[in-house]
C-alpha cells in the first residue's frame, strides 16, 4: 500500500499538488501497518492517519473511527497511539462516525480517556440527534456535563481567533467579468471533486498566466486577494470557489485537499458566488475596485469599511454584508457558524438559559406595514410566518432540493463532511444529465455509485439518458413552496428556489432548511399581446432589452449596472402560460444574476401540470426508481393540493425595489442575445445577415413544442446549411417526438440528434468547432463555453431552425415569411405539452414492479391520501 501510495504522491508532486485523500481500503491497510509500524515509516504513517483521511461519514472515516475507538477501549494496541491519543484524534474528525464512540468514552473508567473525550466532543459540532444522548447523560456523568457546558458557552467559537482589525494583502486582479466557467472550466468538470487538480485549470482560457502570477505575488509575504470588476457570474458551481480558495486560501486542519479563508473583492459579486464564498469561510467584499491593480499591497480594515494603499491613503470604502460576516469568517464559514450557533442555542434553551450574547445576531428590518410580494409570502410560509421582509435573515424549509452529475460528486463529499446519513428535505433529486451522452470512466463510476448514495438517504435518483435536471425537478414541485439546487438554473416555475453551491445544497438536503438573507424584489409586468412571429424566448430577451432602454442594465463590466443583480425577479401578466412555458421565463433569471424568481400562474394551469406529474411519478415507481417512499409522499402531497387547489398572490400594496413594464405590443420582431454575453441583447434586424455555421436546439430552455415547430420549418426543405444539433430535454419528449415522426424530419435535414440531456449547453462534453458562429437555444453564451473562440447567439427554437435553413440570421421579412407560412397556421397542433394523465396506460410504461408489489401511499404515510 505504501509503495503504491508513494508512486501516487510522486505523480501528483510533478503537478504541484498533494495526493488524493486515502480511501477506505488504503485506510484499512494503514491501520494494519500502525499495529506494528516499521521504524522508518512511523512519522509518515501517523501523518497519513491524522491528516489524509476524509472526515465525517466517508467510508475511510468509518475505518479510522473504528480503529481509534478500538485503541481507546484497549481492544487494539498501537505503539504510536496511546488511548488518550486515540481519543484526541477522534476529536479531529468533525462529526459523524466519531460521535457515538466519543459519547461512549465519556463513560470510561479511565478518567484521562473520559476527560479527553469531553474535550473532543466540546469542539465537535456535527452531533445532530446525538445531542439528546449527551444531554441525558449529563444528568449523571460529569464529563458529559462538561460537554454540555462547553456547547452552552460556545467554546468551539471562543477558541477560534477573531478576524484581525487590519488585513494586509497583495492584489491579484482579473479585469472585467470573471464567470464561474473561467474559474472552473466545464471541460474539466470530471475533476471537480479533486479540488487541487481541478484548480490547475482555473483561468486557463481567461488569463493563462494567472496561476503563475498568483504564485509570484505570494512571494511578497502577504495573502493574495482575488479582485475583479464583476466576479462569479454564471453557474452555481462550488468548484469555482474551491479553485479560488485553493490558490488564495489556507489549509483546513485534518481535512485533506480543501482550503478555507481568503479575500475576494469585486465591484459586483454574483449572489450565488457570494453565498458560496461565505459558506467556505472567505471574506467577500463588494467595493469600487477601479484603483486596485495586480501587485498592489493594500490593507483592508473590515470593521472600519475602508481599504488603504501602501501610503496609508484610503482608496475605496465598503460596507460588510451580511452583518454576521465576521462571525462567519471566524467560524470557518457560514455553514459551520449556523450549525455551531444552533448547537449553542439549543443547549442553552435546554438548560433554561437565554440566547448567547457571543454571536452577532441578524437585525430584523423595520416592518413597513405594507403588504408582501408573492416571493415574500412563499418564503414566509416556509418560515411559519405571513411574510419575510427584504434584509431578513431566515432559514426557510427546503421542500425540494436538486443535484446534478457535475455538482453531485461535490455535494456527496459535502454531505459526508456534514455527517449526513439521511435527508431532512422532503424530496432531494439527483440527475445524470450533463455527463450521460459521452461519459468518461470517472463519469461511469459516478453513474454507478451516486444513485445508491442518494436513494439510501431517502433521495430520488434518475438514470443516465432520462434528461435534464430542471425538466424533471419541475415536475416534482409543490405550489408555493421553497427549494434549492446545485445548478444556477434551478429556477422553479412553481414556488420559488434559491440556487446554491454544493455545500449549501448539501446543507439544505441534510437539514431540510437553508440560510437566506431575503433579497429585494423587482417586479416585471407584462402587458399587451404577443405579436406575430414573436415567441416566448423573445420575451425572455425583451426583459434585459427593456431594462437597457431604461438605463437599468449595461453590458460593459466596468461600473456595471444591473437592476436585477442579487434580487428576486417577480413576473406577472401572463397567468395562462403552461408551466413548461413559464419555466422559460424563470430559467433565464439566472442570466440576469437574480437570486430567485416567481411567476404568477392560474390555478387551472398549475392543476393541469400536477395531474400530469402524479402519473409520471407513479410510472417512475412502476419502473423501479428509488426512493419509492419519497415519490409516494410527493404524490400524496400533490393529490392533497389538487383536492383543494389554492395559490398565493402578492399584495396590491407590496413594495418592490423597481418595477419594469414589458409591453408585448411593442415587441415586433425576435430579440437575440448577441455574442458573447447574455446581456448583449439586440433586435434580430441588427444582426441580420450574420453567417451561422452551427445551430443547437436543446437545453432546459426548450420543451416539446419547440421541436415540433422547428421540424415544421425544416420539413421538405432538404439538408440544412451547416451543422444542426437536436437534443430534447427528456426521454419522454424524445419518445413522443419519435412516435410523431419528428425525428424522421430531423434526419432528412441532416441533423445530429443527441441523447436527452444538456449536450452542448455546458460545453463539458460535445462542443462546436473552434471559431465558428453558432445560433443556440441554450442558456448562456459566455466566451469559450460551447467551443473555443465560438461566437454564440441565443434565441428561440423557431429562429434557430430558420438560421439552420438559411445558414444565416434572416431579415425580419425572411423570418416572418417562413414562420407565418409554416408555424402560425399550426400553432394549436405544434404547441401541445406532455400531459401524461392523458396518455393511455402511461402509468404502466416500462413497468418492472408488479402491481401487487407496488408500495401503497397509505402504508408509507400511515394515513389515507389527501388526509390533513
UniProtKB/Swiss-Prot annotation:
Coiled-coil intervals, chain numbering: none
Cofactor(s) named in the record: [4Fe-4S] cluster
Cofactor note: Binds 1 [4Fe-4S] cluster per subunit.
Record flagged with keyword Nucleotide-binding: no
Biological pathway: Carbohydrate metabolism; tricarboxylic acid cycle; isocitrate from oxaloacetate: step 2/2; Organic acid metabolism; propanoate degradation
Keyword presence, Iron: yes
Keywords: 4Fe-4S, Iron, Iron-sulfur, Lyase, Metal-binding, RNA-binding, Tricarboxylic acid cycle
GO molecular function: 2-methylisocitrate dehydratase activity; 4 iron, 4 sulfur cluster binding; aconitate hydratase activity; metal ion binding; mRNA 3'-UTR binding; mRNA binding
Residues holding substrate: 192, 235-237, 404-406, 488, 780, 785
Binding locations of [4Fe-4S] cluster: 700, 758, 761
Record EC number: 4.2.1.3, 4.2.1.99
Reaction(s) the record says it catalyses: citrate = D-threo-isocitrate; (2S,3R)-3-hydroxybutane-1,2,3-tricarboxylate = 2-methyl-cis-aconitate + H2O
GO cellular component, one term: cytosol
A Gene Ontology biological process term: propionate catabolic process, 2-methylcitrate cycle
Record CDD domains: AcnB (cd01581), AcnB_Swivel (cd01576)
Function: Involved in the catabolism of short chain fatty acids (SCFA) via the tricarboxylic acid (TCA)(acetyl degradation route) and probably via the 2-methylcitrate cycle I (propionate degradation route). Catalyzes the reversible isomerization of citrate to isocitrate via cis-aconitate. Catalyzes the hydration of 2-methyl-cis-aconitate to yield (2R,3S)-2-methylisocitrate. The apo form of AcnB functions as a RNA-binding regulatory protein.
Protein family membership: Belongs to the aconitase/IPM isomerase family.
Subunit structure: Monomer.
Protein name: Aconitate hydratase B
Species this protein is from: Synechocystis sp. (strain ATCC 27184 / PCC 6803 / Kazusa)
Gene: acnB
Amino acid at each position: 500500500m505504501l509503495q503504491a501510495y508513494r508512486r501516487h504522491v510522486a505523480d501528483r508532486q510533478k503537478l504541484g499538488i498533494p495526493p488524493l485523500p486515502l480511501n477506505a481500503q488504503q485506510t484499512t491497510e494503514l491501520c494494519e501497518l500502525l499495529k506494528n509500524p516499521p521504524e522508518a515509516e512511523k512519522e509518515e504513517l501517523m501523518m497519513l492517519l491524522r491528516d489524509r483521511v476524509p472526515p465525517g461519514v466517508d467510508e475511510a472515516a468509518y475505518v479510522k473511527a473504528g480503529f481509534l475507538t478500538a485503541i481507546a477501549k484497549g481492544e487494539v494496541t498501537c505503539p504510536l497511539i496511546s488511548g488518550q491519543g486515540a481519543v484526541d484524534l477522534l476529536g479531529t474528525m468533525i462529526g459523524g462516525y466519531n460521535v457515538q464512540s466519543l459519547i461512549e468514552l465519556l463513560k470510561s473508567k479511565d478518567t484521562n480517556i473520559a476527560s479527553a473525550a469531553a474535550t473532543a466532543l466540546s469542539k465537535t459540532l456535527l452531533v445532530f440527534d446525538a445531542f439528546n444522548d449527551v444531554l441525558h447523560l449529563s444528568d449523571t456523568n460529569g464529563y458529559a456535563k462538561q460537554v454540555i457546558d462547553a456547547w452552552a458557552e460556545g467554546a468551539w467559537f471562543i477558541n477560534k481567533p477573531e478576524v484581525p482589525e487590519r488585513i494586509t494583502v497583495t492584489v491579484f486582479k482579473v479585469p472585467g467579468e470573471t464567470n464561474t466557467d473561467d474559474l472552473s472550466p466545464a471541460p474539466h468538470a470530471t475533476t471537480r471533486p479533486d479540488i487541487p487538480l481541478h484548480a490547475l485549470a482555473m483561468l486557463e482560457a481567461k488569463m493563462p498566466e494567472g496561476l503563475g502570477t498568483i504564485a509570484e505575488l505570494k512571494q511578497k509575504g502577504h495573502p493574495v486577494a482575488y479582485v475583479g470588476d464583476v466576479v462569479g457570474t454564471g453557474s452555481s458551481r462550488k468548484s469555482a470557489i474551491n479553485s479560488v480558495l485553493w490558490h488564495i486560501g489556507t489549509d483546513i486542519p485534518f481535512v485533506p485537499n480543501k482550503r478555507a479563508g481568503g479575500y475576494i473583492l469585486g465591484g459586483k459579486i454574483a449572489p450565488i458566488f457570494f453565498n458560496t464564498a461565505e459558506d467556505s469561510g472567505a471574506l467577500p467584499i463588494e467595493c469600487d475596485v477601479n484603483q486596485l491593480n495586480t501587485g498592489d499591497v493594500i490593507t483592508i480594515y473590515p470593521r472600519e469599511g475602508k481599504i488603504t494603499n501602501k501610503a496609508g491613503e484610503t482608496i475605496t470604502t465598503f460596507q460588510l454584508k451580511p452583518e454576521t460576516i465576521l462571525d462567519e469568517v471566524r467560524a470557518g464559514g457560514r455553514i459551520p457558524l449556523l450549525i455551531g450557533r444552533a448547537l449553542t442555542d439549543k443547549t442553552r434553551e435546554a438548560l433554561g438559559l437565554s440566547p448567547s450574547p457571543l454571536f452577532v445576531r441578524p437585525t430584523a428590518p423595520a416592518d413597513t406595514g405594507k403588504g408582501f410580494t408573492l416571493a415574500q409570502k412563499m418564503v414566509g410560509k416556509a418560515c411559519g410566518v405571513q411574510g419575510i421582509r427584504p434584509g431578513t435573515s431566515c432559514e426557510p424549509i427546503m421542500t425540494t432540493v436538486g443535484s446534478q452529475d457535475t455538482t453531485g460528486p461535490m455535494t456527496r463529499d459535502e454531505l459526508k463532511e456534514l455527517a449526513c446519513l439521511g435527508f431532512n428535505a422532503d424530496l432531494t433529486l439527483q440527475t445524470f444529465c450533463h455527463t450521460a451522452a459521452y461519459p468518461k470512466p470517472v463519469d461511469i463510476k459516478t453513474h454507478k455509485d451516486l444513485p445508491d448514495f442518494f436513494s439510501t438517504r431517502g433521495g430520488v435518483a434518475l438514470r443516465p439518458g432520462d434528461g435534464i435536471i430542471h425538466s424533471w425537478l419541475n415536475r416534482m414541485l409543490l405550489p408555493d413552496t421553497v427549494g434549492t439546487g446545485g445548478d444556477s438554473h434551478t429556477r422553479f416555475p412553481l414556488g420559488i428556489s434559491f440556487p446554491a453551491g454544493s455545500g449549501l445544497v448539501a446543507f439544505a438536503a441534510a437539514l431540510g432548511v437553508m440560510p437566506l438573507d431575503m433579497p429585494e424584489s423587482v417586479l416585471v409586468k407584462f402587458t399587451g399581446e404577443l405579436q406575430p412571429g414573436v415567441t416566448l424566448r423573445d420575451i425572455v430577451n425583451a426583459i434585459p432589452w427593456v431594462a437597457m432602454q431604461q438605463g437599468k442594465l449595461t453590458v460593459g463590466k466596468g461600473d456595471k449596472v444591473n437592476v436585477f443583480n442579487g434580487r428576486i425577479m417577480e413576473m406577472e401578466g401572463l397567468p395562462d402560460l403552461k408551466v413548461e412555458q413559464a419555466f422559460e421565463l424563470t430559467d433565464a433569471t439566472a442570466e440576469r444574476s437574480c437570486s430567485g424568481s416567481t411567476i404568477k400562474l392560474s390555478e387551472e394551469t398549475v392543476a393541469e401540470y400536477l395531474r400530469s406529474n402524479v402519473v409520471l411519478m407513479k410510472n417512475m415507481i412502476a419502473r423501479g426508481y428509488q426512493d419509492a417512499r419519497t415519490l409516494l409522499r410527493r404524490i400524496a402531497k400533490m393529490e392533497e393540493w389538487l383536492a383543494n387547489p389554492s395559490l398565493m398572490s402578492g399584495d396590491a400594496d407590496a413594495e418592490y425595489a423597481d418595477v419594469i413594464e414589458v409591453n408585448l405590443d411593442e415587441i415586433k420582431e425576435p430579440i437575440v442575445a448577441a455574442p458573447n454575453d447574455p446581456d448583449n441583447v439586440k433586435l434580430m434586424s441588427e444582426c441580420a445577415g450574420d453567417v451561422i455555421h452551427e445551430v443547437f436546439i436543446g437545453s432546459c430552455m426548450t420543451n416539446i413544442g419547440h421541436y415540433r415547430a422547428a421540424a415544421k420549418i425544416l420539413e421538405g426543405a432538404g439538408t440544412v446549411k451547416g451543422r444542426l444539433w437536436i437534443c430534447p430535454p427528456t426521454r419522454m419528449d424524445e419518445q413522443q417526438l419519435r412516435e410523431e415522426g419528428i425525428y424522421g424530419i430531423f434526419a432528412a435535414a441532416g441533423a445530429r440528434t443527441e441523447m436527452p440531456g444538456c449536450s452542448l449547453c455546458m460545453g463539458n462534453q460535445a462542443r462546436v468547432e473552434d471559431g465558428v458562429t453558432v445560433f443556440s437555444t441554450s442558456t448562456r453564451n459566455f466566451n469559450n463555453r460551447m467551443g473555443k473562440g465560438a461566437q454564440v447567439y441565443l434565441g428561440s427554437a423557431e429562429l434557430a431552425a430558420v438560421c439552420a435553413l438559411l445558414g444565416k440570421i434572416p431579415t425580419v421579412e425572411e423570418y416572418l415569411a417562413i414562420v407565418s407560412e409554416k408555424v402560425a397556421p399550426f400553432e394549436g397542433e405544434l404547441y401541445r405539452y406532455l400531459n401524461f394523465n392523458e396518455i393511455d396506460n402511461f402509468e404502466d410504461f416500462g413497468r418492472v414492479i408488479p402491481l401487487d408489489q407496488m408500495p401503497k401511499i397509505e402504508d408509507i404515510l400511515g394515513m389515507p391520501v389527501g388526509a390533513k
